[in-house]
Amino acid sequence: MAPSKQYDEGGQLQLMDAERIEEEEECFESIDKLISQGINSGDVKKLQDAGIYTCNGLMMHTKKSLTGIKGLSEAKVDKICEAAEKLLSQGFMTGSDLLIKRKSVVRITTGSQALDELLGGGIETLCITEAFGEFRSGKTQLAHTLCVSTQLPIHMHGGNGKVAYIDTEGTFRPERIVPIAERFGMDANAVLDNIIYARAYTYEHQYNLLLGLAAKMAEEPFRLLIVDSVIALFRVDFSGRGELAERQQKLAQMLSRLTKIAEEFNVAVYITNQVIADPGGGMFITDPKKPAGGHVLAHAATIRLMLRKGKGEQRVCKIFDAPNLPEGEAVFQVTSGGIMDAKD
Protein backbone atom coordinates (compact mmCIF):
# COMPACT_ATOMS: atom_id res chain seq x y z
CA MET A 1 0.00 0.00 0.00
CA ALA A 2 1.24 3.48 -0.84
CA PRO A 3 1.93 5.65 2.22
CA SER A 4 -0.99 7.85 3.24
CA LYS A 5 -0.75 11.49 4.21
CA GLN A 6 -1.56 13.53 7.28
CA TYR A 7 -0.91 17.04 8.53
CA ASP A 8 1.42 18.09 11.31
CA GLU A 9 0.52 21.02 13.56
CA GLY A 10 1.96 23.44 11.01
CA GLY A 11 -0.43 22.20 8.39
CA GLN A 12 2.19 20.44 6.27
CA LEU A 13 1.49 17.05 4.80
CA GLN A 14 3.36 14.22 6.49
CA LEU A 15 3.52 10.51 5.69
CA MET A 16 1.57 8.33 8.08
CA ASP A 17 3.62 5.59 9.72
CA ALA A 18 2.93 1.90 9.17
CA GLU A 19 1.30 1.50 12.59
CA ARG A 20 -1.26 4.20 11.83
CA ILE A 21 -2.06 2.61 8.45
CA GLU A 22 -2.65 -0.74 10.17
CA GLU A 23 -5.10 0.94 12.56
CA GLU A 24 -7.03 2.30 9.58
CA GLU A 25 -7.15 -1.14 7.94
CA GLU A 26 -8.47 -2.79 11.10
CA CYS A 27 -11.78 -0.95 10.62
CA PHE A 28 -12.82 -3.41 7.92
CA GLU A 29 -11.87 -6.73 6.33
CA SER A 30 -11.00 -6.52 2.63
CA ILE A 31 -13.14 -8.65 0.31
CA ASP A 32 -9.88 -10.14 -1.03
CA LYS A 33 -9.56 -12.12 2.22
CA LEU A 34 -12.39 -14.37 1.01
CA ILE A 35 -9.83 -16.03 -1.28
CA SER A 36 -8.09 -17.45 1.81
CA GLN A 37 -11.44 -19.07 2.72
CA GLY A 38 -11.64 -20.93 -0.58
CA ILE A 39 -13.63 -18.42 -2.63
CA ASN A 40 -12.66 -18.18 -6.30
CA SER A 41 -10.83 -14.96 -7.22
CA GLY A 42 -13.18 -14.55 -10.17
CA ASP A 43 -16.18 -14.46 -7.84
CA VAL A 44 -14.42 -11.91 -5.64
CA LYS A 45 -13.88 -9.77 -8.74
CA LYS A 46 -17.62 -9.96 -9.48
CA LEU A 47 -18.36 -8.66 -6.00
CA GLN A 48 -15.93 -5.77 -6.50
CA ASP A 49 -17.50 -4.94 -9.86
CA ALA A 50 -20.83 -4.71 -8.02
CA GLY A 51 -19.37 -2.16 -5.58
CA ILE A 52 -18.66 -4.54 -2.68
CA TYR A 53 -15.08 -4.16 -1.43
CA THR A 54 -15.20 -5.34 2.19
CA CYS A 55 -16.57 -8.34 4.05
CA ASN A 56 -18.41 -5.89 6.30
CA GLY A 57 -20.14 -4.42 3.27
CA LEU A 58 -20.93 -7.89 1.95
CA MET A 59 -22.81 -8.82 5.13
CA MET A 60 -24.92 -5.67 4.75
CA HIS A 61 -26.45 -7.09 1.55
CA THR A 62 -29.29 -9.58 1.41
CA LYS A 63 -28.72 -12.90 -0.35
CA LYS A 64 -31.46 -11.90 -2.77
CA SER A 65 -29.50 -8.83 -3.87
CA LEU A 66 -26.25 -10.83 -4.11
CA THR A 67 -27.82 -13.44 -6.40
CA GLY A 68 -28.75 -10.53 -8.65
CA ILE A 69 -25.05 -10.08 -9.44
CA LYS A 70 -24.29 -11.63 -12.81
CA GLY A 71 -22.46 -14.95 -12.46
CA LEU A 72 -23.31 -15.61 -8.80
CA SER A 73 -25.69 -18.51 -8.18
CA GLU A 74 -27.52 -19.16 -4.91
CA ALA A 75 -25.01 -21.88 -4.04
CA LYS A 76 -22.09 -19.52 -4.63
CA VAL A 77 -23.72 -16.77 -2.58
CA ASP A 78 -24.30 -19.18 0.33
CA LYS A 79 -20.65 -20.22 0.23
CA ILE A 80 -19.45 -16.60 0.03
CA CYS A 81 -21.61 -15.51 2.98
CA GLU A 82 -20.44 -18.48 5.03
CA ALA A 83 -16.82 -17.55 4.34
CA ALA A 84 -17.45 -13.91 5.28
CA GLU A 85 -19.09 -14.94 8.56
CA LYS A 86 -15.92 -16.84 9.49
CA LEU A 87 -13.87 -13.67 9.03
CA LEU A 88 -16.27 -11.45 10.94
CA SER A 89 -18.04 -11.52 14.27
CA GLN A 90 -21.64 -10.74 13.31
CA GLY A 91 -23.50 -12.16 16.31
CA PHE A 92 -24.43 -10.76 19.69
CA MET A 93 -21.92 -9.00 21.93
CA THR A 94 -22.08 -7.75 25.50
CA GLY A 95 -22.73 -4.14 26.35
CA SER A 96 -19.15 -3.93 27.64
CA ASP A 97 -17.78 -5.13 24.30
CA LEU A 98 -19.94 -2.61 22.48
CA LEU A 99 -18.65 0.16 24.75
CA ILE A 100 -15.09 -0.81 23.81
CA LYS A 101 -16.05 -0.85 20.13
CA ARG A 102 -17.54 2.64 20.49
CA LYS A 103 -14.07 3.90 21.37
CA SER A 104 -13.28 3.75 17.66
CA VAL A 105 -15.72 6.64 17.14
CA VAL A 106 -13.93 9.81 16.01
CA ARG A 107 -15.44 13.20 16.81
CA ILE A 108 -14.58 15.92 14.32
CA THR A 109 -14.49 19.53 15.47
CA THR A 110 -16.96 21.95 13.91
CA GLY A 111 -14.63 24.90 14.47
CA SER A 112 -16.78 26.22 17.33
CA GLN A 113 -16.06 25.08 20.87
CA ALA A 114 -19.63 25.86 21.96
CA LEU A 115 -21.05 23.75 19.13
CA ASP A 116 -18.56 20.94 19.82
CA GLU A 117 -19.64 20.87 23.48
CA LEU A 118 -23.29 20.68 22.43
CA LEU A 119 -22.47 17.70 20.19
CA GLY A 120 -20.41 15.89 22.81
CA GLY A 121 -17.12 16.61 21.06
CA GLY A 122 -18.03 17.16 17.42
CA ILE A 123 -19.54 15.38 14.42
CA GLU A 124 -19.40 11.61 15.08
CA THR A 125 -18.22 8.85 12.78
CA LEU A 126 -20.28 5.64 12.43
CA CYS A 127 -23.53 7.58 12.11
CA ILE A 128 -25.52 10.12 10.08
CA THR A 129 -25.74 13.70 11.32
CA GLU A 130 -28.47 15.77 9.67
CA ALA A 131 -28.62 19.56 9.75
CA PHE A 132 -31.83 21.21 8.59
CA GLY A 133 -32.95 24.80 8.42
CA GLU A 134 -33.90 27.66 6.13
CA PHE A 135 -31.52 29.15 3.59
CA ARG A 136 -28.57 31.05 5.13
CA SER A 137 -28.92 29.16 8.42
CA GLY A 138 -25.33 27.86 8.21
CA LYS A 139 -25.78 24.30 6.90
CA THR A 140 -23.42 24.62 3.92
CA GLN A 141 -20.99 26.83 5.85
CA LEU A 142 -20.66 24.07 8.43
CA ALA A 143 -20.05 21.59 5.60
CA HIS A 144 -17.19 23.73 4.22
CA THR A 145 -15.60 24.02 7.67
CA LEU A 146 -15.84 20.25 8.21
CA CYS A 147 -14.05 19.72 4.87
CA VAL A 148 -11.00 21.30 6.49
CA SER A 149 -11.29 20.25 10.15
CA THR A 150 -11.68 16.59 9.14
CA GLN A 151 -8.12 16.68 7.81
CA LEU A 152 -6.64 17.82 11.12
CA PRO A 153 -4.79 15.18 13.19
CA ILE A 154 -6.76 13.32 15.85
CA HIS A 155 -4.98 15.14 18.68
CA MET A 156 -6.20 18.45 17.20
CA HIS A 157 -9.81 17.15 17.24
CA GLY A 158 -9.77 16.33 13.55
CA GLY A 159 -10.44 13.10 11.70
CA ASN A 160 -7.01 12.60 10.08
CA GLY A 161 -8.72 11.63 6.83
CA LYS A 162 -10.04 12.68 3.45
CA VAL A 163 -13.45 14.08 2.54
CA ALA A 164 -16.02 13.09 -0.10
CA TYR A 165 -18.53 15.81 -1.06
CA ILE A 166 -21.70 15.17 -3.09
CA ASP A 167 -23.27 18.46 -4.13
CA THR A 168 -26.89 18.44 -5.33
CA GLU A 169 -27.48 22.20 -5.33
CA GLY A 170 -24.21 23.57 -6.74
CA THR A 171 -23.25 25.41 -3.54
CA PHE A 172 -19.74 24.02 -2.91
CA ARG A 173 -17.05 26.65 -3.48
CA PRO A 174 -13.38 25.55 -3.44
CA GLU A 175 -12.29 29.17 -2.97
CA ARG A 176 -14.24 29.14 0.32
CA ILE A 177 -11.93 26.39 1.57
CA VAL A 178 -8.81 28.59 1.22
CA PRO A 179 -9.40 31.05 4.12
CA ILE A 180 -10.72 28.24 6.32
CA ALA A 181 -7.54 26.23 5.72
CA GLU A 182 -5.43 29.31 6.49
CA ARG A 183 -7.31 29.78 9.75
CA PHE A 184 -6.31 26.26 10.82
CA GLY A 185 -2.72 26.81 9.65
CA MET A 186 -3.01 24.31 6.81
CA ASP A 187 -1.87 24.36 3.20
CA ALA A 188 -4.98 25.20 1.14
CA ASN A 189 -3.89 23.33 -2.00
CA ALA A 190 -3.13 20.19 0.01
CA VAL A 191 -6.52 20.46 1.74
CA LEU A 192 -8.31 20.76 -1.61
CA ASP A 193 -6.37 17.77 -2.97
CA ASN A 194 -7.81 15.68 -0.13
CA ILE A 195 -11.42 16.55 -1.01
CA ILE A 196 -13.13 14.57 -3.77
CA TYR A 197 -16.15 16.35 -5.22
CA ALA A 198 -19.07 15.32 -7.41
CA ARG A 199 -22.07 17.29 -8.66
CA ALA A 200 -25.24 15.18 -8.75
CA TYR A 201 -28.09 16.07 -11.10
CA THR A 202 -30.67 13.31 -10.50
CA TYR A 203 -31.51 11.06 -7.56
CA GLU A 204 -30.22 8.09 -9.60
CA HIS A 205 -26.93 9.88 -10.24
CA GLN A 206 -26.71 10.65 -6.53
CA TYR A 207 -27.19 6.98 -5.60
CA ASN A 208 -24.68 5.76 -8.20
CA LEU A 209 -22.07 8.14 -6.81
CA LEU A 210 -22.52 6.51 -3.41
CA LEU A 211 -22.02 3.06 -4.93
CA GLY A 212 -18.75 4.18 -6.51
CA LEU A 213 -17.46 5.60 -3.22
CA ALA A 214 -16.89 2.15 -1.72
CA ALA A 215 -13.90 1.52 -3.99
CA LYS A 216 -12.21 4.77 -2.94
CA MET A 217 -12.94 4.34 0.76
CA ALA A 218 -11.56 0.79 0.71
CA GLU A 219 -8.25 2.11 -0.64
CA GLU A 220 -7.81 5.50 1.04
CA PRO A 221 -8.39 6.86 4.57
CA PHE A 222 -11.66 8.79 4.28
CA ARG A 223 -13.28 10.16 7.42
CA LEU A 224 -16.19 12.31 6.20
CA LEU A 225 -18.93 12.09 3.58
CA ILE A 226 -21.06 15.18 2.93
CA VAL A 227 -24.32 15.21 0.96
CA ASP A 228 -25.61 18.77 0.45
CA SER A 229 -28.57 18.52 0.20
CA VAL A 230 -29.92 15.02 0.69
CA ILE A 231 -33.52 15.72 -0.35
CA ALA A 232 -33.26 18.33 -3.14
CA LEU A 233 -33.15 15.97 -6.13
CA PHE A 234 -35.90 13.73 -4.75
CA ARG A 235 -38.22 16.74 -4.51
CA VAL A 236 -37.46 17.60 -8.15
CA ASP A 237 -37.53 14.10 -9.68
CA PHE A 238 -40.75 13.03 -7.92
CA SER A 239 -43.77 15.31 -7.97
CA GLY A 240 -47.25 15.08 -6.53
CA ARG A 241 -48.87 12.64 -4.13
CA GLY A 242 -49.01 9.96 -6.81
CA GLU A 243 -45.22 9.56 -6.73
CA LEU A 244 -44.76 10.12 -3.00
CA ALA A 245 -44.63 6.42 -2.07
CA GLU A 246 -41.99 5.69 -4.72
CA ARG A 247 -40.00 8.76 -3.68
CA GLN A 248 -39.91 7.68 -0.05
CA GLN A 249 -38.88 4.15 -1.04
CA LYS A 250 -35.98 5.43 -3.15
CA LEU A 251 -35.01 7.88 -0.41
CA ALA A 252 -34.99 5.03 2.13
CA GLN A 253 -32.66 3.00 -0.12
CA MET A 254 -30.23 5.89 -0.42
CA LEU A 255 -30.27 6.59 3.32
CA SER A 256 -29.66 2.90 3.98
CA ARG A 257 -26.62 3.13 1.72
CA LEU A 258 -25.35 6.13 3.69
CA THR A 259 -25.76 4.23 6.97
CA LYS A 260 -23.82 1.28 5.59
CA ILE A 261 -20.98 3.55 4.41
CA ALA A 262 -20.77 5.16 7.86
CA GLU A 263 -20.55 1.82 9.66
CA GLU A 264 -18.47 -0.03 7.07
CA PHE A 265 -15.66 2.54 6.83
CA ASN A 266 -15.97 4.39 10.17
CA VAL A 267 -16.74 7.71 8.48
CA ALA A 268 -18.93 10.58 9.60
CA VAL A 269 -21.86 11.25 7.28
CA TYR A 270 -23.07 14.85 7.34
CA ILE A 271 -26.22 15.59 5.35
CA THR A 272 -28.10 18.85 4.97
CA ASN A 273 -31.86 19.00 4.60
CA GLN A 274 -34.43 21.55 3.52
CA VAL A 275 -37.48 22.63 5.48
CA ILE A 276 -41.13 22.79 4.49
CA ALA A 277 -44.16 24.57 5.93
CA ASP A 278 -45.80 22.79 8.86
CA PRO A 279 -49.57 23.44 8.84
CA GLY A 280 -49.92 21.65 12.17
CA GLY A 281 -47.10 23.55 13.83
CA GLY A 282 -49.38 25.40 16.21
CA MET A 283 -51.14 28.76 16.24
CA PHE A 284 -48.59 30.34 18.59
CA ILE A 285 -45.59 29.63 16.34
CA THR A 286 -44.77 32.23 13.69
CA ASP A 287 -44.25 30.64 10.26
CA PRO A 288 -43.81 27.04 11.53
CA LYS A 289 -41.39 24.82 9.60
CA LYS A 290 -40.43 21.15 9.70
CA PRO A 291 -37.67 19.14 7.99
CA ALA A 292 -38.46 17.61 4.59
CA GLY A 293 -38.26 13.86 4.02
CA GLY A 294 -40.91 12.70 6.46
CA HIS A 295 -40.53 9.72 8.79
CA VAL A 296 -38.10 7.94 6.45
CA LEU A 297 -35.44 10.59 6.92
CA ALA A 298 -36.32 11.12 10.58
CA HIS A 299 -35.58 7.47 11.41
CA ALA A 300 -32.42 7.26 9.26
CA ALA A 301 -30.56 10.21 10.79
CA THR A 302 -28.92 9.39 14.12
CA ILE A 303 -28.40 13.00 15.17
CA ARG A 304 -30.69 15.78 13.91
CA LEU A 305 -29.69 19.42 14.25
CA MET A 306 -32.00 22.37 13.68
CA LEU A 307 -30.18 25.52 12.53
CA ARG A 308 -31.68 28.99 12.48
CA LYS A 309 -30.52 32.54 11.95
CA GLY A 310 -29.52 34.71 14.88
CA LYS A 311 -28.27 38.29 15.13
CA GLY A 312 -26.08 39.38 12.22
CA GLU A 313 -23.75 36.53 11.30
CA GLN A 314 -24.72 34.50 14.36
CA ARG A 315 -26.52 31.18 13.98
CA VAL A 316 -28.23 28.97 16.55
CA CYS A 317 -27.99 25.17 16.58
CA LYS A 318 -30.52 23.12 18.55
CA ILE A 319 -30.39 19.38 19.23
CA PHE A 320 -33.61 18.23 17.57
CA ASP A 321 -33.04 14.50 18.13
CA ALA A 322 -30.10 12.42 19.37
CA PRO A 323 -29.82 9.10 21.24
CA ASN A 324 -26.97 10.20 23.50
CA LEU A 325 -27.22 14.00 23.75
CA PRO A 326 -29.48 16.15 25.95
CA GLU A 327 -31.60 18.89 24.44
CA GLY A 328 -29.79 22.17 24.22
CA GLU A 329 -28.69 25.05 22.03
CA ALA A 330 -25.40 26.61 20.99
CA VAL A 331 -24.71 29.93 19.31
CA PHE A 332 -21.96 30.12 16.70
CA GLN A 333 -20.82 32.56 14.07
CA VAL A 334 -20.11 32.34 10.34
CA THR A 335 -16.83 34.09 9.48
CA SER A 336 -14.40 34.17 6.56
CA GLY A 337 -12.47 31.48 8.44
CA GLY A 338 -15.51 29.22 8.72
CA ILE A 339 -17.59 28.32 11.77
CA MET A 340 -16.37 29.91 15.02
CA ASP A 341 -17.65 30.74 18.49
CA ALA A 342 -20.00 33.72 18.54
CA LYS A 343 -18.62 37.05 19.71
CA ASP A 344 -20.65 39.05 22.20
UniProtKB/Swiss-Prot annotation:
Stored InterPro entries: Dmc1 (IPR011940), DNA_recomb/repair_Rad51_C (IPR013632), DNA_recomb/repair_RecA-like (IPR016467), DNA_repair_Rad51/TF_NusA_a-hlx (IPR010995), P-loop_NTPase (IPR027417), RecA_ATP-bd (IPR020588), RecA_monomer-monomer_interface (IPR020587)
Tissue-by-tissue expression: Highly expressed in spikelets. Expressed in meiotic young panicles.
A GO cellular component entry from the record: condensed nuclear chromosome
Keywords, alphabetical: ATP-binding, Cell cycle, DNA-binding, Meiosis, Nucleotide-binding, Nucleus
CDD domains: DMC1 (cd19514)
Binding-site list for ATP: G133, E134, F135, R136, S137, G138, K139, T140
Chain positions recorded as dsDNA binding sites: R235, R241, R247
Coiled coil: none
Annotated ssDNA binding sites: R235, F238, R241, R247, R315
Disulfide bonds: none
Major subcellular site: nucleus
A GO biological-process term: DNA recombinase assembly
Gene Ontology molecular function: ATP binding; ATP-dependent activity, acting on DNA; ATP-dependent DNA damage sensor activity; DNA strand exchange activity; double-stranded DNA binding; single-stranded DNA binding
Subcellular compartments: Nucleus
Described purpose of this protein according to its UniProt entry: Recombinase that may participate in meiotic recombination, specifically in homologous strand assimilation, which is required for the resolution of meiotic double-strand breaks. Exhibits DNA-dependent ATPase activity when bound to single-stranded DNA (ssDNA). Mediates renaturation of homologous complementary strands as well as assimilation of single strands into homologous supercoiled duplexes leading to D-loop formation. Binds circular single-stranded DNA (ssDNA) and circular double-stranded DNA (dsDNA) in vitro. Catalyzes DNA homologous renaturation and DNA strand exchange.
Family: Belongs to the RecA family. DMC1 subfamily.
The protein's name: Meiotic recombination protein DMC1 homolog B
Provenance organism: Oryza sativa subsp. japonica (Rice)
Gene name per UniProt: DMC1B
